[in-house]
């Protein structure tokens, strides 16, 4: 019995423990599980409702999308029709524009082609004419006839005389021209009492003073300041050169600084001119003027044909002594050269002031001719002139310019025929080559 009671008590204890410690958690767990199940069921119901709503919304969206798509398609069709119409209109306008532009281009090309053909035809005509002229003047008699015809035309100009100035005075203004004339007259009176040696010394003294004035710009400017009282200028001049030059040179220079000059450089030009006149007077007394003039003109042509030599003689970087040495070396290699020509050319090279050497040499030759009251005419011909033609050229030009004329002839076969005459700055071009060139230049563009 006790065993049964003990087992009963044990069972009761177990039941108590289970009830006390096991049942409450189980109940709580079951309640939680029930809550979870209920929540899941509620969620499932909500999801089902949402699914139904989503399905309904999807169906509505699909229907709306279909309707919108149909609307977009219709609008696209309308836009396509409108764009097609616009493109057709624009294409028509563009086609018309291209057509008009094409017509203009065709007209422009036609005009250009016509102009080009005319130009080519003109050039070909000139070329053919040139060939005919060349063939015609290949006969010396026909070439001489072109000179005679030009002289006939030139002869008609003879009554209209032109005044030709001294070569040096051509670039001076009126005051300097008067001063130069007075200085030349002073020299002419002084030269009568001087022998050739004194004239040569005078030329050398004047060149040295011209070089001094060329270096001393301020002194030159002071000596040419316009003022009524020339005494201060004379005193300055005497302090500078007294005892260094001879009395004839000092007399010339005193007269020079008393004159009124338009520009400072004109004083140097005038002194250089008188120094040349002194040497030319020596040549005239010795009967060497013709030879001197010929050699000076020949040397100017050499410089014109040899630009390199002209540049070397006018190179201011090289001292004057070096350039004069080069000049003398060239003249010595040429054979016998008139000593006065050597002296004149040496002075010219020493006193170059920005002028090309070939122009300075030509001016020197013109000064030599002008001293005899003659005018220099540079005549260019395709061939040598006969004596009768040369005489006629001299006579016609003498009547035109009212002075005796010295003709310096140059031959250039490229001129074909006729003559080109240059007197100072005036050029009379009656060559066949220039007429052909003028004809070609007048062709339409």
Curated annotation (Swiss-Prot):
It comes from the Bacteria. It holds the Pfam family ATP-synt_B. It is found in: Cell membrane. It is a single-pass membrane protein. Residues 1-168 are annotated as: ATP synthase subunit b. Residues 169-445 are annotated as: ATP synthase subunit delta. GO terms for molecular function: proton-transporting ATP synthase activity, rotational mechanism. The chain crosses the membrane at residues 4-23. Keywords: ATP synthesis, Cell membrane, CF(0), Hydrogen ion transport, Ion transport, Membrane, Multifunctional enzyme, Transmembrane, Transmembrane helix, Transport. InterPro entries: ATP_synth_B-like_membr_sf, ATP_synth_b/b'su_bac/chlpt, ATP_synth_F0_bsu_bac, ATP_synth_OSCP/delta_N_sf, ATPase_OSCP/dsu. One of its GO terms (cellular component) is plasma membrane. F(1)F(0) ATP synthase produces ATP from ADP in the presence of a proton or sodium gradient. F-type ATPases consist of two structural domains, F(1) containing the extramembraneous catalytic core and F(0) containing the membrane proton channel, linked together by a central stalk and a peripheral stalk. During catalysis, ATP synthesis in the catalytic domain of F(1) is coupled via a rotary mechanism of the central stalk subunits to proton translocation. This fusion protein includes a component of the F(0) channel (subunit b) and of the F(1) subunit (subunit delta). Two copies of subunit b and one of delta together form the peripheral 'stator' stalk which links F(1) to F(0). HAMAP family: ATP_synth_b_bprime, ATP_synth_delta_bact. In the N-terminal section; belongs to the ATPase B chain family. In the C-terminal section; belongs to the ATPase delta chain family. NCBIfam families: ATP_synt_b, PRK13428.1, PRK13430.1. F-type ATPases have 2 components, F(1) - the catalytic core - and F(0) - the membrane proton channel. F(1) has five subunits: alpha(3), beta(3), gamma(1), delta(1), epsilon(1). F(0) has three main subunits: a(1), b(2) and c(10-14). The alpha and beta chains form an alternating ring which encloses part of the gamma chain. F(1) is attached to F(0) by a central stalk formed by the gamma and epsilon chains, while a peripheral stalk is formed by the delta and b chains. This is ATP synthase subunit b-delta. It comes from Mycobacterium marinum (strain ATCC BAA-535 / M).
């Amino acid at each position: 019995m006790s065993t049964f009671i003990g087992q009963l008590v044990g069972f009761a204890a177990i039941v108590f423990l289970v009830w006390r410690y096991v049942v409450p958690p189980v109940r709580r767990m079951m309640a939680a599980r029930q809550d979870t199940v209920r929540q899941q069921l509620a969620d499932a119901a909500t999801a089902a409702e949402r699914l139904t709503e989503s399905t309904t919304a999807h169906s509505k969206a699909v229907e709306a999308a279909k309707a919108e798509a149909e609307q977009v398609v219709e609008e696209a069709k309308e836009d396509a029709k409108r764009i097609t119409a616009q493109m057709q209109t624009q294409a028509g306008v563009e086609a018309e524009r291209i057509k008009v532009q094409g017509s203009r281009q065709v007209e422009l090309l036609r005009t250009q082609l016509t102009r080009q053909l005319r130009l080519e035809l003109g050039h070909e005509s000139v070329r053919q004419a040139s060939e005919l002229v060349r063939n015609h003047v290949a006969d010396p008699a026909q070439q001489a006839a072109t000179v005679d015809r030009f002289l006939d035309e030139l002869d008609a100009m003879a009554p209209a005389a032109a005044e030709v100035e001294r070569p040096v005075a051509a670039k001076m203004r009126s005051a300097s021209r008067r001063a130069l004339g007075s200085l030349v007259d002073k020299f002419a009176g002084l030269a009568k009492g001087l022998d050739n040696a004194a004239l040569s010394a005078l030329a050398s003294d004047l060149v040295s003073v011209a070089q001094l004035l060329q270096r001393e710009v301020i002194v030159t400017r002071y000596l040419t300041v316009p003022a009524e009282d020339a005494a201060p200028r004379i005193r300055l001049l005497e302090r500078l050169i007294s005892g260094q030059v001879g009395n004839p040179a000092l007399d010339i220079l005193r007269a020079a600084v008393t004159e009124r000059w338009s520009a400072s450089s004109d004083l140097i030009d005038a002194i250089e001119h008188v120094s040349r006149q002194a040497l030319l007077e020596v040549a005239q007394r010795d009967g060497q003027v013709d030879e001197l003039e010929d050699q000076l003109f020949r040397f100017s042509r050499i410089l014109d044909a040899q630009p390199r030599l002209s540049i070397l003689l006018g190179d201011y970087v090289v001292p004057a002594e070096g350039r004069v040495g080069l000049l003398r070396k060239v003249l010595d290699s040429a054979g016998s050269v008139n000593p006065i020509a050597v002296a004149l050319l040496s002075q010219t090279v020493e006193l170059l002031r920005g002028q090309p050497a070939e122009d300075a040499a030509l001016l020197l030759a013109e000064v030599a001719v002008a001293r005899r009251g003659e005018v220099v005419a540079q005549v260019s011909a395709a061939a040598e002139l006969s004596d009768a033609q040369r005489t006629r050229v001299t006579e016609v030009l003498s009547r035109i310019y009212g002075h005796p004329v010295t003709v310096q002839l140059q031959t250039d076969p490229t001129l074909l025929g006729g003559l080109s005459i240059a007197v100072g700055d005036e050029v009379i071009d009656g060559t066949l080559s220039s007429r052909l060139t003028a004809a070609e230049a007048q062709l339409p563009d």
